[in-house]
Structure formats: C-alpha cells, structure tokens
Amino acid sequence: MKNFALIGAAGYIAPRHMRAIKDTGNCLVSAYDINDSVGIIDSISPQSEFFTEFEFFLDHASNLKRDSATALDYVSICSPNYLHYPHIAAGLRLGCDVICEKPLVPTPEMLDQLAVIERETDKRLYNILQLRHHQAIIALKDKVAREKSPHKYEVDLTYITSRGNWYLKSWKGDPRKSFGVATNIGVHFYDMLHFIFGKLQRNVVHFTSEYKAAGYLEYEQARVRWFLSVDANDLPESVKGKKPTYRSITVNGEEMEFSEGFTDLHTTSYEEILAGRGYGIDDARHCVETVNTIRSAVIVPASDNEGHPFVAALAR
C-alpha cells in the first residue's frame, strides 16, 4: 500500500483522483486546499488529514518522512493550472513521485525545469493523459497503424462543454491562470491526436475568444479541423436543452463512438503509473508545445477545406 497526499482537494477533478487512490488499494493520508468544501473525503478516506494552508501541509508531509511506514510515496495535484509547476516542484522536493492533472504546465521551458528537478530529486513526474487509455482511442490508433493509408485522414474534432456565468469569474476564466480555453479544455484532445496520428506538422488558429477557439492541425497521418467552446449557444440544435455537452470526432466522415467509457480512466491511469507504465514529461511535451503555440498564434482566415464548419457560423 502506497501513501498519497493530494493538493487541490476541493477541485472538480479531485474526487476522481481520490477514488483512483482508493480503488488501486492505496491510502490518502493528507489533503490540502485553500477551500474547505471537501466533504467527499468522508466517503473515500475519512482518516485523511486536511489543511487549508500550504505551509502546514508541507510541515505535516515533512514530519511523515521520519518514519518509512508513514512517509508519503506520491503527491497528486489537482490545483488550478497556474499552480501546477510550484506544486509539482514541492512534491518532488518532498521526496515523492508526483501525479499531475493536465495541462502539466503551460510552456516547454517549464517542462525542462521540471526535468532538472526530477534529476535532482531522483523522483518521477507523471501526467494524467487519460484518453490514451480510452478503448475507442486505442482501437482507432490500431486501425490507423494497420491500414497504413497513403492518404491523410480527414478529421473533425468538436467539443462543447457548456459553462455558466461563474466560469469567467473563476480562475478558469482568467487566461493568466487557466492559459485560455484551448489549453484548459483542449490539451488532452491534442495529446490524443498526436497519440493516434503522429507528429504535428502545421498548427493554425482561425478564431479565439474567452469562450471558444478553433483552428487547423496537420499531423503525419491526419488533417484536423477543431472547434472547442464553453458557450451553450454553440451546441447543435439536436442537443440543446437536452445535454450540456457535445463531443464529436469524425474520421473520413465517419462518426467515432466516443460518448461512453470515461468513468474509470483515472483509475486506469493510476494502475498504469503504479505498474511503472505512466506517462511522463517526454510524453506530455507534444501537447504542451501545441497549446503554447496556439496561445501565441496570429489569427488567420481559414484556407479552403481547413476551417471547421462551426467557424463559418461565427462569421455570420
């Protein structure tokens, strides 16, 4: 049994990490968040210590190191995006391996610095890239490898996850903290595309705002038109008033079944990490580079057949 601490315990994604820790037979012994809305801990690990001040959390973690039976093995990080880097560094320097939510960090330069800290501490950093464990994604990757098509696949990626007025007033709506909508809700999709279709060759942005972004990505084996949004007005008429989220991936005009299979992906990710097969800094580098380019890109009009259909609707 491994001992875990969790940073960002009141966040949206934290319960998935808590359950993954429990479901893999391990123990959450300490948790931290500046907010105290963490009642979920009662149903998962009621014996866990909890702190609302980081200094006390660090002191407790350091004290646990005095006994090998209580010392932390892993620190899981679910804090806001802009705090990932300092929290990862703190976890590694505590002498722990670290598991961090996406996006790992906003820039390749920060990845380089974390690699230095890994070497200094002789500990490992793992990123949650859960779509690599989704059975539909694995099946598509295998199909692409098997077919060895001489032509690039034509892919449309659409992801709309409706958010209310609170969104822009939270850290998620502040691009200095979330790094923008394409990073916050899209980074795992860019990792998925790289995982399936190989190296990125072109990265063009056609539209970006605080609510949505769109562009074109060309990989070794695919041409991808993408559209991401947190605006409910972008939902197709077929789902408006029925579902708050719309997720669609078409490959050569064929809709990929991608509506189920997300429930246990964090647990699968933890199982792989604990078995020594987790995804580290080098695995995350491609998607970090992709979103870093998107954030700084000059917006250009879509060339023929490179613009996502939803972008044309925005211009009307």
UniProtKB/Swiss-Prot annotation:
* Thermal behavior of activity: Optimum temperature is 30 degrees Celsius for the coupled WbpB/WbpE reaction.
Q: In which pathway does it act?
A: Bacterial outer membrane biogenesis; LPS O-antigen biosynthesis
Q: Which UniProt keywords apply?
A: Cell wall biogenesis/degradation, Lipopolysaccharide biosynthesis, NAD, Nucleotide-binding, Oxidoreductase
Disulfide bonds, which pairs?
none
How does the activity vary with pH? Optimum pH is 8.0 for the coupled WbpB/WbpE reaction.
Residues binding NAD(+), per UniProt: 11-13, 32-37, 55, 81-84, 101-102, 130, 171-172
Annotated GO molecular function terms are: NAD+ binding; NADH binding; NADH dehydrogenase activity; phosphoglycerate dehydrogenase activity
InterPro entries listed in its UniProt record: Gfo/Idh/MocA-like_OxRdtase_C, Gfo/Idh/MocA-like_OxRdtase_N, Gfo/Idh/MocA_Oxidoreductase, NAD(P)-bd_dom_sf
| GO BP, one annotated term | cell wall organization
Keyword field contains Endoplasmic reticulum: no
**Catalytic reaction list:** UDP-2-acetamido-2-deoxy-alpha-D-glucuronate + NAD(+) = UDP-2-acetamido-2-deoxy-alpha-D-ribo-hex-3-uluronate + NADH + H(+); 2-hydroxyglutarate + NAD(+) = 2-oxoglutarate + NADH + H(+)
E.C. numbers: 1.1.1.335
Taxonomic superkingdom:
Bacteria
UniProt xrefs under Pfam families: GFO_IDH_MocA, GFO_IDH_MocA_C
Q: Does the keyword RNA-binding apply?
A: no
Q: What else is known?
A: Seems to proceed via a ping-pong reaction mechanism.
Q: Identify its protein family.
A: Belongs to the Gfo/Idh/MocA family.
**What the protein does?**
Plays a role in the biosynthesis of B-band O antigen for serotype O5. Catalyzes the NAD-dependent oxidation of UDP-N-acetylglucosaminuronic acid (UDP-D-GlcNAcA) to UDP-2-acetamido-2-deoxy-3-oxo-D-glucuronic acid (UDP-3-oxo-D-GlcNAcA). Cannot use UDP-GlcNAc or UDP-GalNAc as the nucleotide sugar substrate, and can use only poorly UDP-D-glucuronic acid (UDP-GlcA). Undergoes an NAD(+) recycling mechanism using 2-oxoglutarate as an oxidant.
Q: How does it assemble?
A: Homotetramer.
Under what name is this protein listed?
Answer: UDP-N-acetyl-2-amino-2-deoxy-D-glucuronate oxidase
